Every structure is written in structure tokens, then in C-alpha cells.
Amino acid sequence: GNFEPVICLQLYIKIGSAWEKEDEAGFSHFMEHLTFKSTVKFPFNQIAAYISKLGGSINAYTDFDCTCYYISLPSEFVMEGLEVLAELAFHSTFTKEDVEVEKDIILEEMVQNTLDPETNFLQFVQDAAFTNYPLKRPILGTKESIKKASYKELRDFYHKYYQPHNSFLVIAGEAEF
């Protein structure tokens, strides 16, 4: 049958919970939330709708060693997908209000995680296995670190780590550039 060639774009930022300083606990995950808010070319919450209109999907995740933004879309829109990833990674315009809104969302996410037996078990194993290592830190951070996180601290974190020399791009699929 007929099918449309699809491409997957993954942009990795080399910062995750294991590389955060103690007072930055959860900042990598916080960035994952904030970068989607708005960018120079995509005002408030328009990124997902734009990718969807192109027939694609976009998401992100934070891990111990990286934060990954990924897009799957028809290959003919590879340049549009790359533009969106560049906007997220290097041109985010999140605001003080965005920080406060996302704080509440992340704190609620923490509550939901405490209700999940699998998440609790994995955190227990991490705590036991990595007693003196940064891998012990929860990806979401701590209630204290998230509550006290300021707009300036998060903005500084973004500008420090969200740099071309601290990222890499993976492209899978068929596309012409």
C-alpha cells in the first residue's frame, strides 16, 4: 500500500538529574516543561499544535544523563521539525508566570508518583544502590528544590546548558535536506 515517509528527530541536551548541583535538583525536568511554553517564533503553547498540523507529534523526557526532545513527522517537513527543535533548545521565552504555573504541575506530578508502586520501588532501588552518587537523585527533584526555584535560577540554568556544544541531534528516516 501507499505510505508517507516519516522521519524521527531527537535533540538531546546533555543535562539530566545526575549532573545537577544539589540546589538545581529537578531543574532539567523543569526545563522540559518550560521550553514548550513559548519561543521566539512560537508564542504561548503553539508548538504542539504546529507539529500536529504538519501531521506529526512532539514530546520530551528527562533522564539521569540527558533531556530529549523528539518529533515524528512526515519526511517532507524535516526542516520545519528541525526549526522547532532549535526554537525549544535555544530560543525559549518562558516567563515568571510560566515558572509558577509549572511549579504547581511538577509538585502535583510528585504527588502522583508517590501513589505509583512502580515509581516508589524504582526510587527505593536507586536510593539503596547509589547511596553516595548523583544517580540517587529523583529526576523530578525534591519538593524543596522545586518550591524554591526562581525564574532567574531557571533562566540561568537554561542558558548554561542549552547550548549547541552541549547537545546532539539524531535523525532517523528518509529525508532530503
Q: Where are the regions a protein language model picked out?
A:
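Charge-rich, well-structured scaffold segments of protease-associated domains
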Residues: 44-177
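His/Glu-rich zincin catalytic helix
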Residues: 1-46, 83, 155-177
